[in-house]
C-alpha cells in the first residue's frame, strides 16, 4: 500500500511552509537558551567548529533529500516515505517508528522550552509570594491548547500560526543584532585574538546544541500537503539550511563581542541583555521560536504515523486502519494527531526531557545517515528509473553518512548503541509479521 497522501482542503502548500517550518526550528530553543553557553565555553573558533561539523551532516542530508525528492513524487510521511521506498517497507518502518517518536517527543521538548520565556513571571511569583510554581502550570495548558488546535483544525491553522510566530522571531533577531553593550565597546575583539578554549568539552557542548540543526528537515514532513514536493522540498530545505548556517555565524560573532565568557555561560537569556528592548523582545522571541517549533513538530509527527499506518506497519490491522485513516473532508491525520499529542503530553508532565533530547538526536542522526546512504548507493546501484532532476555528488552523500554515524558515537556511545539496539528489536518484530516484504534489495 502506498504512503498516505493528504488531499483536500489542506493540500496545495507551496515552498514557504517547508522553509519556515525548518528555519523556525533551526533558530529555535537551543539558540535562545543554550547557544550563549556554547560560545562562552568554547570561544569564537569553537563555535565556528560546531557550525562546520554540524553542517557536514546537515548540508549533505539536505542535498540527499533534494535528490531523492526529485526522483519521484514524495507522498505523505516525508523522510519516512523516502526511506521506505528506497530501503523497503520493513527497514523503512523501523526507521520510521524511531523518527515518529523523535518528532512526538520533540513537541514536548519545545513546549517545555516555551515555558522558559516565562522565567520573569516565575521569579516574580517566588519573590512576591515565596511560592515556587512548577513549570507545568504553563506547559500543560499550552500543550492542551496546541493539541486541540491541531486535532480540530489541522495543518491550515498550524501554518497560519507559524507565519505569525516566525515574524516575531525575525523581529527579535533584528533587535538582537542592532543592540549593543558596554562590553562591546571595550572588548577589542579581532579574528586574530579570537579563542578556541576548553577543547576537551567540545563534544559535550556539541551534544547540547546539535538538536538545533536537526530542524533542517522539519518541513519535509509536510510532503503529502505540498502542491509540488519536487520543487518545494529542495528549495525549502536547502534554503533553510544555508540561511540558518549564515545566521548562526553572525550570532557567534555578536555574542563574542557583546558579553564576557562568564556572562555567556551563566546567563541562559544573555541575548536579552544585548538586544534593544531585550527584557521584552527576547522572551517573546524565545516564546515564538519554541512555539513555532512545537507547531511544526505537531504537524509533522502525525503525518509520519499516518503513513506508517497506511503502509500496514503495525502487527494489528485495526491499529493500521485507525492510524492510517484521514479526516473525511480533508485527509487530516486526526487519529494520528491524538496519539502524537498524547505521547507529547506524557513527557510534558514529566517536565524534563534533557536526557531524552540526546536520544532524539540519535534517532535523527540515524535518519540523516540513512538518507545519505540511500543517495550514495543510488549513485552506483540504482535502477534505470532513478532519474532525479536534482543530483548531489556521491562523495558528498558518503561524507554525510560517515559523519552522521561518527557524531552519534562521539556525542554519547551508550545512547548510540541503545538507539541501534532498539531499532534492531523493532526491525525483528516488523520482519516477523511482514516476511513477504523486500529489504535492502529494494534499492537495486
Where are these predicted regions, by residue range?
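Membrane-water interface regions at transmembrane-helix termini and the short interhelical loops
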Residues: 34-41, 70, 94, 142-165, ...
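Membrane-interface loop-to-helix entry segments
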Residues: 46, 135-183, 196-197, 214, ...
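Hydrophobic transmembrane alpha-helices that form the core helical bundles
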Residues: 59-144, 291-304, 349-373
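Loop-to-transmembrane helix boundary motifs in multi-pass membrane proteins
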Residues: 2, 7-18, 89, 133-141, ...
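C-terminal membrane-solvent junction of multi-pass transporters and transport-like membrane proteins
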Residues: 320-334, 368-415, 439-444
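Membrane-interface "cap" regions at the ends of multi-pass membrane proteins
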Residues: 1-78, 397-399, 432-444
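TM-loop-TM module centered on a large, flexible mid-protein loop between adjacent transmembrane helices
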Residues: 81-82, 88, 120-125, 242-295, ...
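Helix-loop-helix junctions that connect adjacent transmembrane segments
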Residues: 5, 47, 127-134, 163-283
Amino acid at each position: 500500500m502506498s504512503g498516505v497522501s493528504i488531499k483536500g482542503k489542506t493540500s496545495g502548500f507551496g515552498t514557504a511552509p517547508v522553509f519556515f517550518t525548518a528555519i523556525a526550528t533551526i533558530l529555535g530553543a537551543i539558540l535562545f537558551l543554550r547557544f550563549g553557553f556554547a560560545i562562552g565555553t568554547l570561544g569564537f573558533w569553537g563555535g565556528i567548529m560546531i557550525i562546520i561539523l554540524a553542517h557536514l551532516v546537515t548540508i549533505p542530508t539536505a542535498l540527499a533529500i533534494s535528490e531523492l525528492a526529485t526522483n519521484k513524487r514524495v507522498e505523505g510521511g516525508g523522510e519516512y516515505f523516502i526511506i521506505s521506498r528506497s530501503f523497503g517497507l520493513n527497514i523503512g518502518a523501523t526507521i520510521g517508528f524511531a523518527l515518529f517518536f523523535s518528532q512526538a517527543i520533540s513537541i514536548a521538548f519545545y513546549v517545555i522550552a516555551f515555558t522558559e520565556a516565562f522565567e520573569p513571571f516565575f521569579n516574580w511569583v517566588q519573590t512576591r509570594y515565596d511560592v515556587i510554581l512548577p513549570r507545568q502550570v504553563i506547559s500543560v495548558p499550552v500543550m492542551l491548547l496546541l493539541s486541540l488546535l491541531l486535532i480540530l483544525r489541522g495543518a491550515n491553522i498550524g501554518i497560519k500560526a507559524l507565519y505569525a510566530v516566525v515574524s516575531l522571531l525575525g523581529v527579535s533577531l533584528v533587535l538582537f543584532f542592532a543592540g549593543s553593550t558596554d562590553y562591546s565597546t571595550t572588548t577589542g575583539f579581532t579574528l586574530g585574538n579570537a579563542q578556541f578554549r576548553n577543547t576537551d568539552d567540545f563534544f559535550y557542548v556539541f551534544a547540547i546544541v546539535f538538536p538545533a540543526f536537526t530542524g533542517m528537515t522539519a518541513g519535509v514532513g509536510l510532503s503529502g500537503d505540498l502542491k509540488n514536493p519536487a520543487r518545494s522540498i529542495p528549495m525549502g530545505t536547502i534554503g533553510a539550511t544555508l540561511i540558518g548556517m549564515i545566521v548562526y555565524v553572525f550570532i557567534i560573532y555578536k555574542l563574542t563581542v557583546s558579553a564576557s565568557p562568564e556572562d555567556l555561560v551563566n546567563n541562559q537569556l544573555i541575548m536579552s541583555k544585548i538586544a534593544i528592548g531585550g527584557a521584552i523582545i527576547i522572551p517573546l522571541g524565545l516564546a515564538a521560536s519554541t512555539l513555532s517549533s512545537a507547531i511544526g513538530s505537531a504537524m509533522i509527527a502525525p503525518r509520519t504515523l499516518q503513513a506508517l499506518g497506511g503502509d500496514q506497519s503495525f502487527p494489528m490491522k485495526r491499529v493500521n486502519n485507525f492510524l492510517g485513516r484521514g479526516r473525511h473532508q480533508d485527509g487530516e491525520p486526526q487519529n494520528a494527531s491524538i496519539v502524537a499529542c498524547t505521547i507529547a503530553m506524557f513527557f510534558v508532565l514529566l517536565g524534563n526531557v534533557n536526557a531524552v533530547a540526546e536520544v532524539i538526536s540519535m534517532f535523527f542522526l540515524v535518519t540523516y545517515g540513512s538518507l545519505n546512504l540511500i543517495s550514495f548507493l543510488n549513485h552506483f546501484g540504482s535502477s534505470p528509473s532513478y532519474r532525479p532532476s536534482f543530483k548531489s555528488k556521491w562523495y558528498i552523500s558518503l561524507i554525510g553518512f560517515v559523519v552522521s554515524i561518527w557524531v552519534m558515537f562521539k556525542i554519547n556511545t551508550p545512547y548510540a548503541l541503545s538507539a541501534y539496539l532498539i531499532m534492531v528489536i523493532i526491525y525483528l518484530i516488523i520482519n516477523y509479521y511482514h516476511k513477504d516484504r523486500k529489504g535492502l534489495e529494494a534499492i537495486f
